[in-house]
Curated annotation (Swiss-Prot):
NCBIfam families according to UniProt: uS13_bact (TIGR03631)
MF annotations from Gene Ontology: rRNA binding; structural constituent of ribosome; tRNA binding
GO biological process: one example: translation
Cellular component aspect of the GO annotation: cytosol; small ribosomal subunit
The protein's name: Small ribosomal subunit protein uS13
KW ATP-binding (keyword) present: no
Residue ranges crossing the lipid bilayer per the database entry: none
Coiled-coil ranges per UniProt: none
Amino acid sequence: MARIAGVNIPNHQHTEIGLTAIFGVGRTRSRSICVAAGVDFSKKVKDLTDADLEKLREEVGKFVVEGDLRREVTMNIKRLMDLGCYRGVRHRKGLPMRGQRTRTNARTRKGPRRAAQALKK
């Protein structure tokens, strides 16, 4: 297995798909990394030479990926919550922050339904 940016890239996949195992690298960025490194993106990872892998490591190193990206996203969300702006409040309450309806739906953000308390007489 090839190791790039601290992630084991699956050997059986094409380079373009294999690079998407790195957090912060999707299909488009993966293809652009391969083109910039001069590596054929349809080639399997196991068929890459050490020189090709080194070029890919160098190109991936130019982007914010994995732990640094996760930390950056977390800090951005924390900043919004500290500001107390609308998006920060919605993050804090665990509700959708992009204007979706919440009377029905929004189950992914809100979590499983809780049983309603029965009123005492």
